[in-house]
């Protein structure tokens, strides 16, 4: 049985190689008792080696969340100091070629998952005057090409967190939104096989799209450095509301704060070579007219 003075951190999405694993180890290093969650099919070897407490969880399944609460409550005697909503998935596709069912699945993980977690665990957080940490992204702020749906899920998470922060303040619970820049993880692995649909207006960009879904982010922040920053902020008595950390987060924060939103348009158009698409489209239109 853990002593009454023990603090507990519950982190979702702690598969090997991701941000969750790094967060778990950092909370452990800081003297917090971390509790990890894994998808039912994920290996626990990396957590077992570190002596981490873990439970299976599918954040899209109500019964799974309810069972997790029972298990965690039994372990912590009804207390929870940190709830870190980290579980997330990507969906990379052009906005007009989006498969809505795939996006609904992503929203179920990235947005409705945290909502389920807060709905079921809020009483334990209130009992401990705890903190909710929502892992967001610069994608929720900037028009990242081929990421419109993912961007939307992270924008929704951030702004849901804004209202959550105000509503929970009288109950003694803090809410911290992390605006994550590029971090070196394996989150893109499930997108490696994704291709543009046949007949897409973006077919001239097929090779660029393929390279994008197979990319290794340049100058990405090491996930353990990122975890150190995030955990450090969550341990503060009065953390900031939006905490920007990770590669490119500083410059994006500056531009987002002081410039019109269209400041990003030319940047991302150039970064993704959309001039090539325009040239191909213009040529195709001329051929139709001829």
UniProtKB/Swiss-Prot annotation:
One GO term describing the cellular component: lipid droplet
UniProt-annotated location(s): Membrane
- Provide the membrane topology annotation: Single-pass membrane protein
Domain of life, per UniProt, equals: Eukaryota
Q: What is its EC number?
A: 1.1.1.-
Membrane-spanning intervals of the chain: 125-145
What keywords were assigned to this record? Glycoprotein, Membrane, NADP, Oxidoreductase, Transmembrane, Transmembrane helix
GO MF annotations for this entry?
A: acylglycerone-phosphate reductase (NADP+) activity; triacylglycerol lipase activity
Query: Which InterPro entries does the entry mention?
Result: NAD(P)-bd_dom_sf, Sc_DH/Rdtase_CS, SDR_fam
Per the UniProt entry, the glycosylated residues are: 151
- For the ligand (NADP(+)), the binding residues are 11, 37, 58, 86, 150, 154, 183, 185
Q: Which residues form the active site?
A: 150 (proton donor), 154 (lowers pka of active site tyr)
User: What is its induction?
Assistant: Expression is up-regulated during sexual development. Expression is also up-regulated during confrontation with the arthropod fungivore Drosophila melanogaster.
Q: Which GO terms describe its biological process?
A: phosphatidic acid biosynthetic process; triglyceride catabolic process
The UniProt function text for this chain reads:
Short-chain dehydrogenase; part of the gene cluster that mediates the biosynthesis of sordarial, a salicylic aldehyde structurally related to the phytotoxin pyriculol. The most interesting aspect of this pathway is formation of an aromatic product from the highly reducing polyketide synthase srdA. SrdA synthesizes a reduced polyketide chain from one molecule of acetyl-CoA and five molecules of malonyl-CoA. The polyketide chain is then reductively released as an aldehyde.
Protein family per UniProt: Belongs to the short-chain dehydrogenases/reductases (SDR) family.
Task: Report the protein name in the record.
Answer: Short-chain dehydrogenase srdE
Native organism is Neurospora crassa (strain ATCC 24698 / 74-OR23-1A / CBS 708.71 / DSM 1257 / FGSC 987)
């Amino acid at each position: 049985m853990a002593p009454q003075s023990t603090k507990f951190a519950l982190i979702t999405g702690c598969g090997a190689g991701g941000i969750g694993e790094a967060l778990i180890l950092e909370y452990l290093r800081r003297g917090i008792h971390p509790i990890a969650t894994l998808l039912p099919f994920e290996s626990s070897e990396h957590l077992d080696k570190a002596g981490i407490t873990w439970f299976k969880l599918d954040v899209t399944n109500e019964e799974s969340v309810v069972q997790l609460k029972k298990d965690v409550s039994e372990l912590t005697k009804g207390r929870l100091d940190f709830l870190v909503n980290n579980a997330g998935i990507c969906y990379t596709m052009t906005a007009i070629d989006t498969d809505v069912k795939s996006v609904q699945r992503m929203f179920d993980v990235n947005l409705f998952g945290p909502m389920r977690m807060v709905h079921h665990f809020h009483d334990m957080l209130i009992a401990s005057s705890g903190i909710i940490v929502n892992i967001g992204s610069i994608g929720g702020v900037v028009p990242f090409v081929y990421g419109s749906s993912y961007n939307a899920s992270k924008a929704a998470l951030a702004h849901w967190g804004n209202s959550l922060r105000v509503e929970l303040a009288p109950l003694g619970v803090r809410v911290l939104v992390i605006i994550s820049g590029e971090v070196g993880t394996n989150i893109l692995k499930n997108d490696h096989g994704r291709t543009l649909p046949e007949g897409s207006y973006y077919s001239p960009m097929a090779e660029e799209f393929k390279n994008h879904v197979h990319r290794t982010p340049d100058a990405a922040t090491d996930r353990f450095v990122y975890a150190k920053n995030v955990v450090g902020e969550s341990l503060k008595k009065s953390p900031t509301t939006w905490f920007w950390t990770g590669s490119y987060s500083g410059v994006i924060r500056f531009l987002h704060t002081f410039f019109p939103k269209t400041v990003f348009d030319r940047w991302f158009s150039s970064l993704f070579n959309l001039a090539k698409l325009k040239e191909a489209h213009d040529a195709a239109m001329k051929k139709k007219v001829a």
